[in-house]
Amino acid sequence: MAIERGSKVKILRKESYWYGDVGTVASIDKSGIIYPVIVRFNKVNYNGFSGSAGGLNTNNFAEHELEVVG
């Protein structure tokens, strides 16, 4: 099954904050960059300023670091 926009994917990159989590593909860059797939998650990571609830809820991945689920 090919990865496309809107697909639900499981993260296989072990050093990622979202390892094992499921996110939604927001976009796929076709220009040949190393990490072309932008994945959006429901929770934010640990980045942010002290005292703020901010953080990132997207990250770039290579296609081999993702597994399509359902």
Curated annotation (Swiss-Prot):
Any single GO BP term: photosynthesis
Alphabetical keyword list: Membrane, Photosynthesis, Photosystem I, Thylakoid
Record's GO cellular component terms: photosystem I reaction center; plasma membrane-derived thylakoid membrane
Pfam families in the cross-refs: PSI_PsaE
SUPFAM superfamilies xref list: Electron transport accessory proteins
Recorded superkingdom: Bacteria
Main subcellular location: membrane
InterPro entries: Elect_transpt_acc-like_dom_sf (IPR008990), PSI_PsaE (IPR003375)
Subcellular location(s) of the protein: Cellular thylakoid membrane
Membrane topology: Peripheral membrane protein
Family assignment from sequence similarity: Belongs to the PsaE family.
NCBIfam families per record: PRK02749.1
Record's function text: Stabilizes the interaction between PsaC and the PSI core, assists the docking of the ferredoxin to PSI and interacts with ferredoxin-NADP oxidoreductase.
Listed name of the protein: Photosystem I reaction center subunit IV
